[in-house]
Design a protein with these regions (language model features):
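Post-transcriptional modification and biogenesis factors for structured RNAs
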Residues: 1-248
Length: 248
């Protein structure tokens, strides 16, 4: 279970926080740390803060884009402390943990943490199906990045231990309703956008409108079969549009 969950730190500015996060993950039995455009990594500061997590830190993978970092993951969870204009499910860490563990039986699950100064951007949160917020004192709502990682990792481990007495790092099982990876979903979303342009629906580009359209399909984790069906529908529409254009 825990071995199928990855922690993704996006655009971390202080390398010491990366090392401290690695230490927190080792303490809680997680082993997959991914970094998206860190400001400084590798770094002596990160190594110094990692302590027992130095091996995990050395194995951390660095990505140039968030989409690449989560391409092999099914459920994507965004950590956030801010209220935004688009409605979506927001869970506490204890509510989030069993949902992530369930999803990790089918595909890898990812939990995203944004830059220390601003958190995840709206576009980065658009990649998520659910969101987690720690119930901290609103007068002192800012958590250190490594503390936030430790808090969520602790809830994951606690939930795994309560579930079956073991937090074993087993690989995902291949269930009959396999979740689509983020890469598959993003491929579908790009296909859908092309069809909307071809149909004339998006003649006037609107990021706000397309973000709302995107949420229709990403507010929950889609299954592979569902994505394949939707791609088939889009391909059929494309053929009809192309045929109509050729007959003009």
């Amino acid at each position: 279970m825990l071995g199928s969950i990855c922690i993704v730190l996006v655009e971390t500015t202080h390398p010491g926080n990366i090392g401290a996060a690695a230490r927190a993950l080792v303490n809680m039995g997680l082993s997959d740390l991914r970094l998206v455009r860190p400001q400084a990594f590798p770094s002596p500061d990160a190594t110094a803060r990692a302590a027992s997590g130095e091996a995990l830190l050395s194995a951390a993978r660095v990505f140039s884009s968030l989409d690449d970092a989560i391409a092999d993951c099914g459920l994507i969870v965004g950590s956030t402390a801010r209220t935004r204009s688009v409605s979506w499910p927001v869970m506490s860490p204890s509510e989030m943990a069993p949902v992530v563990l369930d999803a990790s039986h089918q595909q890898r699950a990812a939990i995203l943490f944004g830059r220390e100064s601003r958190g995840l951007t709206n576009r980065q949160l658009d990649r998520c199906q659910l969101f987690v917020t720690a119930p901290v004192d609103m007068n002192h709502a800012s958590l250190n990045l490594a503390s936030a990682v430790l808090l969520l990792a602790y809830e994951l481990r606690k939930s795994a231990l309560l579930r079956d007495g073991s937090a074993a790092s087993d690989r995902p099982t291949m269930g009959k309703d396999l979740l689509a990876t983020s890469g598959m979903v993003e491929g579908f979303v790009a296909h859908f956008e092309r069809v909307l342009h071809a149909a004339g629906f998006l003649e006037q580009p609107s990021d706000k409108l397309f973000r709302k359209i995107r949420r229709i399909f990403t507010r929950r984790a889609l299954e592979e079969d569902e994505v394949n069906i939707l791609r088939g529908v889009l391909s059929a529409i494309e053929k009809r549009i192309d045929g109509a254009a050729n007959n003009r």
